[in-house]
Amino acid sequence: MLIQDTIFYRPDWRWHNFLKYLTNNLSKYNCLEKTIPSEYSYKDSTYGSKKSKKNVNLSTWGVTHKKRIKFARAVCINSPNYSVLNFLIIPNTIYNVPFFGVDFVSLPNSYLLVLDFQPSLKIQNQYNNDLLEKLIKLKNHCHSSLPLAEKMSADVARFFSPGVIWSKLPKEERSDFLITNQLYTSFKEYLDLYLEILFESKEVNIELQKELTNGQINYLNYRRDNDPARPMLSSLFGQEFTESLIEEVLFTT
């Protein structure tokens, strides 16, 4: 099933505009859709007690690029309690470019929002001053409207840049307004800047390519072992499917 034919392209899914912007912009850069195994590309399921079963939908969509992108994938979830857009671009390691990471989660009582250029090397080895200044300016503008969430632990923070947008919002009308307007604007600005940098980058030497490969492996292994979405996914789809999804699709190239 094409993701365009699913609920995730419809206005009643919280993150539909974000997903459409992703897919449309990646297609402009001649990215090619990657075939996802059918058991992960679309799944309908139920969760909850026998007396109050709820429906949940999951779709996984991915693309590659012949030179620039190893794998870019979106995982979308829709249910009465949870609505998730998780997106990651894994760049080719012949370019010194960070990951592009998105994690927008609607929980029963709140929203968790993360948007960043996530480093695969130390910040000083991957971000020049011009990029850092641009990111921090965009971040500060976003957080002039969206509250900044609590400080991340050092173990988690090492996988984020100084430009990370990180917010928690209550489920209320004001939050819907902020997501529809400020967050969507910031999301477009971040993605546009990222794709511009990725597609203008020059190839790096073999030694740096090895460092980038090791850095990506380190990040993906950490995410695979410590994915904070694991409990939610397990409650919706069961442990066996969740572990298979994490291992085979979410954090692999």
Swiss-Prot record:
It is an enzyme of class 1 (oxidoreductase). GO terms for molecular function: cobalt ion binding; phycoerythrobilin:ferredoxin oxidoreductase activity. The keyword Oxidoreductase applies. Its EC number is 1.3.7.3. Transmembrane segments: none annotated. GO terms for biological process: phytochromobilin biosynthetic process. Keywords: Oxidoreductase. The keyword Oxidoreductase applies. It catalyses: (3Z)-phycoerythrobilin + oxidized 2[4Fe-4S]-[ferredoxin] = 15,16-dihydrobiliverdin + reduced 2[4Fe-4S]-[ferredoxin] + 2 H(+). It holds the Pfam family Fe_bilin_red. NCBIfam families: PRK13248.1 (NF009721). Belongs to the HY2 family. Catalyzes the two-electron reduction of the C2 and C3(1) diene system of 15,16-dihydrobiliverdin. This is Phycoerythrobilin:ferredoxin oxidoreductase. It comes from Prochlorococcus marinus (strain AS9601).
